[in-house]
Amino acid sequence: MSITRKEILDAISEMSIKNIMKLISNIEKKFNISSNISLNSTQTIQEKVPEEKTAFTVKLNAIGPNKVAIIKIIRSTTGLGLKESKDLVESAPTIIKENINKQDAESLKKNLIDSGAEAEIT
C-alpha cells in the first residue's frame, strides 16, 4: 500500500516546526538538494514572466479613400453622433477607442482596414 500526498501533508501539518525543519534537512541530505533559494533568483523568475496586456487602444492613422464607411464604423463603435464621428475621422491620426479588450480591438481594426483606413492597436 502506498502513501498518498494528502496523507503526507496531513502528517506534516501535525508536526512541530522543529520536527518539520529536521524533516527538511533529512530530505536535503537524502536527495542531495538545497532548499535555499536566494531572493535574487526569485525576482529574476518573476521578471521573466511577461504581464499580459488586457486593455488596448485603437488608433486611426489615415482615412483612406472611403471616408463615409469609416465614419459609419466610428459611429457604430463609439456611439458618437454623425458630426462628432466625422470630426474624429477628419482629425486622423487619432485615437478611436481606448481600454477595450483584445478581441474588440482586433475586430475594430479589421473593420477599419477592410474599409480602406490605416489603423493600429497599441
UniProtKB/Swiss-Prot annotation:
GO CC annotations, alphabetized: cytosolic large ribosomal subunit
InterPro entries found in the cross-reference section: Ribosomal_bL12, Ribosomal_bL12_C, Ribosomal_bL12_C/ClpS-like, Ribosomal_bL12_oligo, Ribosomal_bL12_oligo_N_sf
Protein name: Large ribosomal subunit protein bL12
Function recorded in the entry: Forms part of the ribosomal stalk which helps the ribosome interact with GTP-bound translation factors. Is thus essential for accurate translation.
BP-aspect Gene Ontology terms: translation
Record keywords: Ribonucleoprotein, Ribosomal protein
Gene Ontology MF term list: mRNA binding; structural constituent of ribosome
Gene: rplL
Family, per entry: Belongs to the bacterial ribosomal protein bL12 family.
Oligomer status and interactors: Homodimer. Part of the ribosomal stalk of the 50S ribosomal subunit. Forms a multimeric L10(L12)X complex, where L10 forms an elongated spine to which 2 to 4 L12 dimers bind in a sequential fashion. Binds GTP-bound translation factors.
